[in-house]
Structures are given as C-alpha cells and as structure tokens.
UniProtKB/Swiss-Prot annotation:
Family annotation (Pfam families): EPSP_synthase
Enzyme class, first EC level, given as a word: transferase
Chemical reaction(s) catalysed: 3-phosphoshikimate + phosphoenolpyruvate = 5-O-(1-carboxyvinyl)-3-phosphoshikimate + phosphate
Native species: Rhodopseudomonas palustris (strain TIE-1)
Descriptive protein name: 3-phosphoshikimate 1-carboxyvinyltransferase
This enzyme's EC code(s): 2.5.1.19
Top-level division of the source organism's lineage: Bacteria
Gene this protein is translated from: aroA
Length: 445
C-alpha cells in the first residue's frame, strides 16, 4: 500500500509569473463511475481520459477481481467488458481500495446488489474513515455487513442481497457517495429506489446512469434538495465515456496562478457541472480574473477552457449551502483567502472532518505554521487575509493529497519557502502535479 513508502518531502519557493496551457488529469469522480458502471453493463465500454492515479487504478483492479474484463488500451484509454447488473462474482482476495473512499463506497453499493461475499479494505487513512453511513442503507436493502471495527470501519465483509429491496432513503448528510451507493445497489432491486437529499450533491452518478440506459428521474425537493428515483433491474448497455478534466485538480494551478503576480495560464477541458463549480463562483466573488470559453459537453457533463490571471483578491463569506459543490476545494480556497485582503469566512464545513484527514484542523494547521491568522468556530473556518503569506513552515500532510498540493501552491507566492512533509499521496489523484506545475514555471526543490 502507499502508506508503506518512505516520505518524500518537497519545498515550494516564491516563483516568477506562471505561464502556459495545461490539461489536468481526468475527473476522479467520473473515472470511478465509468469503471463501475462499465463493469455493471452488458457489452463494451470505452473510456478515454481516465484518471490513472492510484485511487482509480485500485477501482479498476476491484472491478477486474469481481469478474469484469478491464484493460488499458493506451494512454488514459481503457476498455471494460461488463458482467451485467447483479453479475459480479465472488473475488478471490480482499478488494484493496488504498486511499479511495469514493471507489470503496461506490463499489460497496454495486456489490450489495449481487449475491456474493466480498471483503473491502484500504490503507490506514481509509480504515479510519466512517462507513456506517454507507452500511446502514445497504442493510435496509438486504445486504449484510460484518466489521470488527467500531463504526463499521474497514476492513469489512459485505454479503450482497440475493433479493434486494427497493427503498426510499433520506441521506443524513449531503453526500454523493451515500446517494450513489444506494442507487447502484438499487439497480438490482425490483421497482423504484428513491433517494432524497436536503442539499443537492454532485450528480455524476445520475448522469452516467442515464448515459448507460437506466431510467432515472430527478425532481426538486425543498429549497436546495433533490429527489432521485431509479427504476431497478435495467439492462445497462456499454457506452463510450470521455472523462473531462477534474475541476478539483484544476483548483491547484488555478489558485496558484491567482496568487502569483503576473501569471496568465489556460486550463483546458475542465468539467463545469454546476454542482462542482462552487470554487469558481467563490473565487470570482473574491475578484479573481477567470474567463471561460469553448464550452461543450459529453455524456451529460459540460466542460470548458479557463484563462486564469494573477489577481488582487478580497475576503468574502462562503455560505454553508455551497459546501456540496466544492467540498474538496476548501483547502486550496483557504490558500486564496490567506493571500486576499480581508477576512474570509467559510461556513458549514463539518464534512471536512471525515475526509482523508480531518481537513478542517489540517487546513488551519497548514495556515498557522506559515504565519496566517486562522480560527475554527464550530464547523466554520475563518481566515484573516493580509495580502501576503509569511511562509517558512513545514506542513504535515496526514497522508492527504489535497493538503500537499494546497501547501505547495501556497509556497509559490509566500515570502519564505513552504515545505510539505510528504508528497507521495499526490499520486492518488494527480500523479503529474509537480512536473506539470514546473512546466508552468513553478519553483519546487
């Protein structure tokens, strides 16, 4: 597993203006879903632009272990021959998802609809993360889950339901992972499986299910929520998938370009799904010079080209209802806030506490060790921006790729270099991050 590797520290130094054009890796969320739905479909699914980070590769290995034929045919080009809904076979060994909560939780939903037994495991970070929120609805649908750890944590054994039940389920928190696990399990159940969420979470699973031929209806629910109804037991058909560039990965060069004076970069093919654009909305409110063009789409997912220039940023208040659309971007938003003039308040960040690390505490620690005034008030993060960051600190990454990349972006514009204690986990989502940033002019060493 990745956590057995020796730490690989890295320092980011104040850089000259960043320039150039880049395409960040394929979207991680869509890459996981393309592999899983391709495995549940009948026939061939061709995927181009797949993210070839460790998290997604572990999902590919899991689908192969469950009986699908999964092969790499070229650079970021993959082919999946699926086994059909409820067609998974019992794997010979535990399914190891490494650091990937998304891959693990979505696969649990997919397996829950097949009459097999599979053991799910991961690295130390994933073993520490809560799984009960996924286990509870799957057990309502007829699956049986056994875990020796408190809170239903990994490793756990999941016995899929022989006769899955359709359910109506209200998610306890806004979570695309919970919703997706229930919908994937619902593929095997007769009748209609319904998920209701009080705050709309990212809808990649719904869009891709439609792309593969499922009947799924989405309706508004209250002020900000959604009701999603899936008709079970469809025959999913293999379909081509073009994976757009990941907006969560694009966030790091984007913020780096905003805070390094004189920068002017372009990022191509970035997904612009409205449930993933909270960061861009917030940065524009802060005064960021971000322009989009060449808007188009594939498999229901829109994408665009972004031009990003060095900008004078100001502090803003970020409302809690925006959290689901940018839950993975708050770390790097905090970096932008540190370079802004004035106070930025980010509200309602409780979900950051159960990510790869306690990202709320880790973000505050990252800023404090580099001389930025920051406060945690309940689930709110308050950053006092002074227009510059002193830097000079060593950031503990806690095996979290997004902490590492956020800290490195900060170091490119801080007064003194910023060091991260380990960059190994960047490979889970963005293996080419360091060389790509160096091509744009970033100073690492």
């Amino acid at each position: 597993m990745t956590d057995s590797n020796q730490p690989t520290p890295l320092q980011a130094r104040k850089s000259g203006a960043l320039h150039g054009t880049a395409r960040v890796p394929g979207d991680k969320s869509i890459s996981h879903r393309a592999l899983i739905l391709g495995a549940l479909a009948v026939g061939e699914t061709r995927i181009s632009g797949l993210l070839e980070g460790e998290d997604v590769i572990n999902t590919a290995k899991a689908m192969r272990a469950l009986g699908a034929k999964v092969e790499r045919t070229g650079d970021c080009e993959w082919r999946v021959h699926g086994v059909g809904v409820a067609g998974f076979a019992t794997p010979e060994a535990p399914l190891d998802f490494g650091n990937s909560g998304t891959g693990c939780r979505l696969a649990m939903g997919a397996v829950a609809g097949s009459p097999i037994v599979a053991t799910f495991d991961g690295d130390a970070s994933l073993r520490s993360r809560p799984m009960r929120r996924i286990v509870d609805p799957l057990e309502l649908m007829g699956a049986k889950v056994v875990s020796s750890s408190e809170g239903g944590r990994l490793p756990l054994a999941l016995q899929g339901a022989r006769d899955p039940l359709p359910i109506l389920y209200r998610t306890p928190v806004p979570s695309a992972q919970i919703k997706s696990a229930v919908l994937l399990a619902g593929l095997s159940a007769p009748g209609v499986t319904t998920v209701i969420e009080a705050e709309a979470s990212r809808d990649h699973t719904e869009l891709m299910l439609q792309h593969f031929g499922a009947t799924i209806v989405t309706e508004a629910e209250g002020a900000h929520g959604r009701k999603i109804s899936l008709t079970g037991q469809p025959e999913l058909r293999g379909a081509p998938v073009v994976v757009p560039a990941d907006p969560s990965s694009a966030a790091f060069p984007m913020v780096a370009a905003l805070v390094v004076p004189g920068s002017d970069i372009e990022l191509t093919d970035v997904m612009t799904n409205p449930l993933r654009t909270g960061l861009i909305t917030t940065l524009r409110e802060m005064g960021a010079l971000i322009e989009d063009s060449d808007v188009r789409g594939d498999a229901g997912e829109p994408m665009a080209r972004f031009r990003v220039r060095g900008s004078k940023l100001k502090g803003v208040e970020v409302p809690p209802e925006r959290a689901p659309s940018m839950i993975d971007e708050y770390l790097v938003l905090a970096v932008a806030a540190a370079f802004a003039e004035g106070t930025t308040v980010m509200r309602g960040l409780h979900e950051l506490r159960v990510k790869e690390s306690d990202r709320l505490e880790a973000t505050a620690a990252m800023l404090r060790v580099n001389g930025v005034a920051v406060e945690i008030a309940g689930d709110d993060l308050i950053v006092e921006g002074k227009g510059h960051v002193p830097g000079g600190g060593v950031v503990a990454t806690h095996m979290d790729h997004r902490i590492a990349m956020s800290a490195l972006a900060m170091g490119l514009a801080s007064d003194k270099p910023v060091t991260v204690d380990d960059t190994a986990f960047i490979a889970t989502s963005f293996p080419d991050f360091v060389p790509m940033m160096q091509r744009l002019g970033a100073e690492f060493g």
